[in-house]
């Protein structure tokens, strides 16, 4: 879609919704609307129902973690209007305690997307019909896509053949730290390490 058409759409939405839109950005051929949490459901409903918009498809909800910010999470809604052949992105900011209103009453397909955002980031959605983990195990500790979550995790899950069941154990890094010599004679160096001499063939 052209920048001009996106600019017109942005102006129309800001004119109709007023203070419900904190910011509208055009970047890389896409329109992003930043809205306060309290206005989210009204904005999503308008974008779905308005004749000029008709964003009837919710294609994704994702989280983004910025731990240095006071409101560390962005909740990002990707919408599609097949009739208008347009895409739009809606963002709200939240912290660990902010209740983001569930989009399920507006887009029924939001249910599993919100469960995933809760599972991976710990973002809380108020009014969600079944807010529980969807990808990690039920006893999982923490939220694995947060920037402060350790790469190794907290527990190791494996099948124990003696007990004939899955067991949870604290993570044990079984390999000591190793300092690798990256100066390999096989990578085009102009020197030969002792013991790596090639036999002469002529």
From Swiss-Prot:
Keyword Cell inner membrane belongs to the record: yes
Gene Ontology molecular function, alphabetical: NADH dehydrogenase (ubiquinone) activity; NADH:ubiquinone reductase (non-electrogenic) activity; quinone binding
Enzyme Commission designation: 7.1.1.-
Catalysed reactions listed for this entry: a quinone + NADH + 5 H(+)(in) = a quinol + NAD(+) + 4 H(+)(out)
Role played: NDH-1 shuttles electrons from NADH, via FMN and iron-sulfur (Fe-S) centers, to quinones in the respiratory chain. The immediate electron acceptor for the enzyme in this species is believed to be ubiquinone. Couples the redox reaction to proton translocation (for every two electrons transferred, four hydrogen ions are translocated across the cytoplasmic membrane), and thus conserves the redox energy in a proton gradient.
Subunit structure: NDH-1 is composed of 14 different subunits. Subunits NuoB, C, D, E, F, and G constitute the peripheral sector of the complex.
The name this protein goes by in its record: NADH-quinone oxidoreductase subunit C
């Amino acid at each position: 879609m052209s920048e001009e058409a996106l600019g017109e759409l942005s102006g129309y939405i800001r004119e109709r919704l007023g203070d419900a839109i904190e910011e509208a950005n055009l970047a890389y051929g896409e329109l992003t609307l930043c809205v306060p949490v309290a206005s989210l459901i009204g904005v999503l409903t308008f974008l779905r129902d308005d004749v000029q918009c008709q964003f009837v498809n919710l294609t994704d909800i994702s989280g983004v973690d910025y731990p240095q910010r006071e409101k560390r999470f962005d909740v990002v809604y990707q919408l599609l209007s097949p009739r208008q052949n347009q895409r739009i992105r809606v963002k709200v900011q939240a912290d660990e305690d902010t209740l983001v209103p569930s989009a399920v009453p507006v887009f029924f397909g939001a249910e599993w997307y919100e469960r995933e955002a809760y599972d991976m980031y710990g973002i809380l959605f108020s009014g969600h019909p079944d807010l529980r983990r969807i990808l990690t195990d039920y006893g999982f500790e923490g939220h694995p896509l947060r920037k402060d979550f350790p790469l190794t995790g907290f527990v190791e899950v494996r099948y124990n053949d003696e007990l004939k069941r899955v067991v949870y154990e604290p993570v044990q890094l079984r390999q000591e730290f190793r300092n690798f010599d990256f100066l390999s004679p096989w990578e085009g160096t102009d020197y030969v390490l002792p013991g790596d001499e090639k036999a002469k063939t002529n």
